[in-house]
């Protein structure tokens, strides 16, 4: 174990009264920079990390390349290779071996990306998020054990606890660290950080650095996480709302969450085309759904349905109303699909832009002919989540991004930092 790692990014999590505390002596971020301008010599100081993100709608692999250009100094983040498969592991709740095979498929990407000489010292880890949190514990563990066997039979380094379900708050914190690191907000003192909004299939996270003492005083217990970085202490507001992801919200809007069973029942909504009769599988369960054949249809009745899902159920910190946030995952996907932003480059939107597009789509459901039949519902839910859930103002600016400096946003990079440090891995 290289001694230069003994004091870098020591990430210690302790639950005290529901609060997550992070402690470090000297952060690894002080010496990690994107070095895309520097060519990589694989034989001289290059090493790798493999992080699997097992989400509710798909499983994603991130293969990170790091370069140690000078012995004894901290490494550079050279780049990332990303791939994914659908559906997510939770869809294989009753076929765990088949679920593990999807991970095996993605492991081939890592083999193709990493030189054989580096396999044995490259760690591989899978962290599952809300999709597996929603499953019965025994079934979730059975899935994870099958994945662990895949890892053990691979040529890569398999650390203890290589396969686990990640706490939602941890997910939000690591995403905030990743985005603020990639945007350069954590490289020096006195710079303003940005908040992060992550919308997955089963859960959603909000994380930001409060600037007002009032926010700290009024925040509910368990929503604050303290940690040290750059010899400064940060106290983040962070919370993960399980069941408020985009696809879980569809079930709530349809009334499927309260239903005793799904067989023979068609769930209907004003957010869907009147003529629609279809089926949808989520979390391994098949749902029949359709439009209101006789009832209302369009934005106003749809918005009333989705507002009931979030209203009064999320904490609304006043401070965020005028703050800037980075938003990704389904925020990005739905904005790109409806041409609110460029699919490759992303863009900046106001919260009200989601509502404008929702009205446009929902009030033209009769002419709907292609794309997702849930588009009206999804856009309306995103609008309600931002406005009625979190309490953002119409004019709040959101930076929608999938990548920063060609690196995927989300929690995976932050988690890989922690993984490599905890194992003491350098070149």
Curated annotation (Swiss-Prot):
The entry's keywords: Calcium, Disulfide bond, Endoplasmic reticulum, Glycoprotein, Hydrolase, Magnesium, Secreted, Signal
Signal sequence range: 1-24
Any GO molecular function: ADP phosphatase activity
This protein's name: Ectonucleoside triphosphate diphosphohydrolase 5
GO CC annotations, alphabetized: endoplasmic reticulum; endoplasmic reticulum lumen; extracellular region; extracellular space
Cofactor(s) required for function per UniProt: Ca(2+); Mg(2+)
Catalytic activity: a ribonucleoside 5'-diphosphate + H2O = a ribonucleoside 5'-phosphate + phosphate + H(+); GDP + H2O = GMP + phosphate + H(+); UDP + H2O = UMP + phosphate + H(+); IDP + H2O = IMP + phosphate + H(+)
Residues of this chain annotated as glycosylated in UniProt: 231
Provenance organism: Rattus norvegicus
């Amino acid at each position: 174990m290289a001694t230069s790692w003994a004091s870098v990014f020591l990430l210690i999590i302790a639950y005290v009264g529901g609060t997550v505390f992070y402690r470090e002596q000297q952060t690894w971020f002080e010496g990690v920079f994107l070095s895309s301008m520097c060519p990589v010599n694989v034989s001289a100081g290059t090493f790798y990390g493999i992080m699997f993100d097992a989400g509710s709608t798909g499983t994603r692999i991130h293969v990170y390349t790091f370069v140690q250009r000078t012995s004894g100094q901290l490494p550079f983040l050279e780049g990332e290779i990303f791939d994914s498969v659908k559906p997510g592991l939770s869809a294989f709740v009753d076929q765990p071996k088949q679920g593990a095979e999807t991970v095996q498929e993605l492991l081939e990407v890592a083999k193709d990306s990493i030189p054989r000489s580096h396999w044995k010292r490259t760690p591989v880890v899978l962290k599952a998020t809300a999709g597996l949190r929603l499953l019965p514990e025994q079934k979730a563990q059975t899935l994870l054990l099958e994945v662990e066997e895949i890892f053990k039979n691979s040529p890569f380094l398999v650390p203890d606890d290589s396969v686990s379900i990640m706490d939602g708050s941890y997910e939000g914190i690591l995403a905030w660290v990743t985005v603020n690191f990639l945007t350069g907000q954590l490289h020096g003192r006195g710079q303003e950080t940005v908040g992060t909004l992550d919308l997955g299939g089963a859960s959603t996270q909000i994380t930001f650095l409060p600037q007002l003492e009032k926010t700290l005083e009024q925040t509910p217990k368990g929503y604050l996480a303290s940690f040290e970085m750059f010899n400064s202490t940060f106290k983040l507001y962070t919370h993960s709302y399980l069941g408020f992801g985009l696809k879980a919200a569809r079930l709530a809007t349809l009334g499927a969450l309260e239903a005793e069973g799904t067989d023979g029942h068609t769930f209907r909504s004003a957010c869907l085309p009147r003529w629609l009769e279809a089926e949808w599988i989520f979390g391994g369960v098949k749902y029949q759904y359709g439009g209101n054949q006789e009832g209302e249809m369009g934005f106003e009745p749809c918005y009333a349905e989705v507002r009931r899902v979030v209203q009064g159920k999320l904490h609304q910190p006043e401070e965020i109303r005028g703050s800037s946030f980075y938003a990704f995952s389904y925020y990005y996907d739905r904005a790109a699909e409806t041409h609110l932003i460029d699919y490759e480059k992303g863009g900046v939107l106001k919260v009200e832009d989601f509502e404008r597009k929702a009205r446009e789509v929902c009030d033209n459901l009769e002419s709907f002919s292609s794309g997702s039949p849930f588009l009206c519902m999804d856009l309306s839910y995103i609008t309600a989540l931002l406005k009625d859930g979190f309490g953002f103002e119409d004019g709040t600016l959101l930076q929608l991004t999938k990548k920063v400096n060609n690196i995927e946003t989300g929690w995976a990079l932050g988690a890989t930092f922690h993984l490599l440090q905890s194992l003491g891995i350098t070149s």
